[in-house]
Amino acid sequence: MLDPSTAGPLTDAPASSLRSILVHVDATTESATRLLVACDLAERHRATVRALFGTAPMADTGSFGYSAGAALDDATALRSLRLEQARAHLQRSLGDRAPDVAWYDVVGETVGHGFLQEAVFADLVVLGQQSASVGRNGGAPAGFVELVAMEGGRPTLVIPHVLSTDAVGRRVLIAWNGSAQAARSVSGALPLLHAADEVHAVTWGRGPSIAPFSRLDIRQHLAGHGIAVTTHQRAPSAHVGEDLIAVAQALGSDLIVMGCYGHGRATERVLGGATRSILRKMTVPVLMVH
């Protein structure tokens, strides 16, 4: 039984409230877009924003005649320089919002593990889409998005390279297939779904209930949360990722909510086909949970 003397204060915040956002920033120009999205969401949901700077390990700065210590000193100095340059650039991009962001650096940990340690205290984490040049020019290390999405256990919002607006979540599209991953993603997205102007759900094959013996479907489930959903049924497809992007474009969606599918191995994480396709070809932000 709870001891009333140790219980926290009661609040009127809903159980699905969004109060803490962690965003990954690095030395790439796309970091500003991620931060602006995070700040816009924070303003709408009265949340705090923490920006965690982390890049792939610096390229080997040693050369013939360099000692290991000198090379390490050079790499540390380069990292510090990149951090200060990135922070100055991002603060200029944020303008009046800059004082509201708490800034951190990954120290003494790999970027992935350092970020995962901070992510456990976030209601939402914000990452950037990775490209073929991943890890170069001050970006995140290879496999960073997969690591956070599959092992972080938090709703993960991935922002595409090119984004026309920082107002994300006005028109939301849910990719629904009745899986545990899709259900966790919908639960993680509830604060955004509550605040959205429109919510759509797309299914492939059977329709919104998916499970043949289910007494509920996604419309009824979200109606119980006070969220109205328009459903769309598509024919079964071998290219669900591409089809999902096409549906999002046709509806004018600015956010896709979907499960993150894949499995981890000892040294790598293998994404499912639809998840991999979306992360490569995404044109709007995607919120996912493994």
Where are these regions (language model features)?
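Redox-cofactor binding/interface segments in oxidoreductases and associated redox assembly factors
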Residues: 23, 127-128, 174, 258
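Short beta-strand elements of ligand-binding domains
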Residues: 127-129, 155-162, 287-290
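Small/aliphatic-rich secondary-structure junction motif
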Residues: 2-71, 151, 164, 168-234
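Glycine-rich, Arg-bearing micro-motifs that act as flexible, cationic patches
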Residues: 127-147, 169, 259-280
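A short acidic, glycine-rich active-site loop
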Residues: 71-85
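Structural beta-alpha unit
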Residues: 1-13, 92-125, 132, 225-256, ...
